[in-house]
Design a protein with these regions (language model features):
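Canonical protein kinase catalytic loop motif
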Residues: 1
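Long, positively charged amphipathic alpha-helical accessory segments at protein N-termini or as interdomain linkers
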Residues: 7-150
Length: 150
């Protein structure tokens, strides 16, 4: 769901997953992960949201090679489990770390549709649960951007 990696509501990185395949056959995922190691001022001025990077968060940031190695090692552990068991075993950890849990949000959907509600979590299948005046709504597909409602 929200693909931003946040630290105190400042974007530290992002995750993008593209799926390809057949409903009845094999499905493939291409996973892109970006982490802001050190942003220069000219880059920050072009970004339309609060950002941060490892250099600002740590006295001595790790090398990019070390970050990549640890990330790949962790993916080597979680991806086989995800393939075998789905999202359900990761749900509780995801809920504990989700920045918008129990917060009012505005969802920007395709075709300029906007919906607002309270994020109540995710289901075992990974669908986002949004409490709206019309009731609890599940979102499973689409380009969705979550923005905290002020």
């Amino acid at each position: 769901w929200p693909n931003d990696i946040l630290h105190r509501f400042h974007k530290l990185g992002g995750i993008l997953i593209e799926l390809s395949g057949d409903v009845l056959g094999p499905t493939y995922a291409v996973i892109g992960i970006g982490i802001n190691a050190r942003l220069d001022e000219s880059s920050v001025s072009k970004i339309n949201q609060a950002t941060t990077d490892l250099a600002n968060l740590m006295e001595t940031p790790p090398s990019r090679s070390l970050v990549l190695g640890k990330l790949l090692a962790q993916l080597g552990v979680v991806l086989p489990r995800f393939e075998a068991e789905g999202f359900a075993p990761f749900r509780d950890e995801w809920l504990a770390l989700h920045a918008y849990q129990n917060r009012a949000v505005r969802m920007l959907l395709p075709r300029n549709t906007v919906e607002e509600g309270i994020v109540t979590g995710v289901a075992d299948d990974g669908s986002l649960l949004l409490d709206r005046p019309s009731g609890l709504t599940r979102y499973t597909v689409g380009e969705i951007s979550l923005t905290a409602v002020t």
